[in-house]
Amino acid sequence: MSIKSDKWIRRMAEQHGMIEPFAPGQVREQDGRKIVSYGTSSYGYDIRCADEFKIFTNINSTIVDPKNFDEKSFVDFKGDVCIIPPNSFALARTMEYFRIPRSVLTICLGKSTYARCGIIVNVTPFEPEWEGYVTLEFSNTTPLPAKIYAGEGCAQVLFFESDEVCETSYRDRGGKYQGQHGVTLPKT
């Protein structure tokens, strides 16, 4: 299994719609102002956060249960900047829609710009033949409120291609998050 380069990422995005919308290079400025970068890097793709958020609140629930998650545990927010309360978290989604090839698995890691501020981005791997908008989780590990910027980079996706195509893909087994569009809560 080998990591894929910028040339491969560009080719797969432009010819096969693997990433839409797609930035073929690194974008570091918008409208003359510096931003958290996004787009193609040497061996990955820096994804952007959309302006749809679900901010965790503990006023409506007493326990967090991934098998029986209460939607009232979140407050919906739409905007260019999301403020995450201290020691809390928020969910968001990517601006990019992904179509992962059958021979590819991705790993997604948070950007150091956020990590250096105590904001951890968590995303599970994108499995072979998964497609959809990615649900992102931002944890604010600090005792202060923290900002997340919509339309800017937040994590990097690394693409790994196997020497052998998998027997059963995410699509084949009817994965529960296949084709997700909005910020998607836990499912069982």
UniProtKB/Swiss-Prot annotation:
This is dCTP deaminase. The active site is at 137 (proton donor/acceptor). Its EC number is 3.5.4.13. Catalyzes the deamination of dCTP to dUTP. Keywords: Hydrolase, Nucleotide metabolism, Nucleotide-binding. The keyword Nucleotide-binding applies. Homotrimer. It holds the Pfam family DCD. The lineage of its organism: Bacteria, Pseudomonadati, Pseudomonadota, Betaproteobacteria, Burkholderiales. Transmembrane segments: none annotated. It catalyses: dCTP + H2O + H(+) = dUTP + NH4(+). GO terms for molecular function: dCTP deaminase activity; nucleotide binding. Pathway: Pyrimidine metabolism; dUMP biosynthesis; dUMP from dCTP (dUTP route): step 1/2. The gene is dcd. It comes from Cupriavidus necator (strain ATCC 17699 / DSM 428 / KCTC 22496 / NCIMB 10442 / H16 / Stanier 337). One of its GO terms (biological process) is dUTP biosynthetic process. Belongs to the dCTP deaminase family. DCTP binds at residues 111-116, 135-137, 156, 170, 180.
